[in-house]
Amino acid sequence: MEIPSYASNIQPYGSQSGTKIASENDNAKSVSLSGDNSRSVSRTDKLSEHFSEQVRARQQESAETAMAQAKQRQRLNEEQLAKMVEQMNEFVKSINKGLSFRLDRESGREVVTIYEASTGDIIRQIPEEEMLEVLRRLAREQDHRSGLLMAKV
């Protein structure tokens, strides 16, 4: 913050910092308190009790608020969990797929067939049937002409 050049540091009524006025007010209060010392002590005790009651009440309120918020978070977490489970069930139902494992006798390899459970349509075979056919042909040719296959390679 920039102070303009026309600003003055002169305090009102000729005092430099206003401390003289404040100290005069403090002396007046201390004089009146020293006259009724027993009355001021009882007033202080009452104020102290009043403040401690207020502090206890606020602590009680804050504890109750914290507990209510924790219960609400727990309810939200339970609701979110239930919603997530429902979404997972819907997802699984939408992709209701079955797996079938089959061993191909000629190649000696396992073929995993993925099909739709309701219709039985084959979605994918790993390795695919075309690849198995190629492997079968290579195996047959190798049995008959193993030397020829080696010579070509």
Curated annotation (Swiss-Prot):
Concerning its family, UniProt says: To FlaG in other Vibrio species.
Gene3D superfamilies membership: FlaG-like
Taxonomy, top ranks, is:
Bacteria, Pseudomonadati, Pseudomonadota, Gammaproteobacteria, Vibrionales
Query: Which InterPro entries does the UniProt entry name for this protein?
Result: FlaG, FlaG-like_sf
Q: Which organism is it from?
A: Vibrio cholerae serotype O1 (strain ATCC 39315 / El Tor Inaba N16961)
Q: Where is this region: Disordered?
A: 1-74
Q: Which spans does this entry mark as compositional bias, Polar residues?
A: 1-41
Compositionally skewed regions (Basic and acidic residues) per UniProt:
42-61
The gene for this chain is flaG
Which Cys-Cys disulfides exist here?
none
Q: Which residues cross the membrane?
A: none
The protein here is known as: Protein FlaG
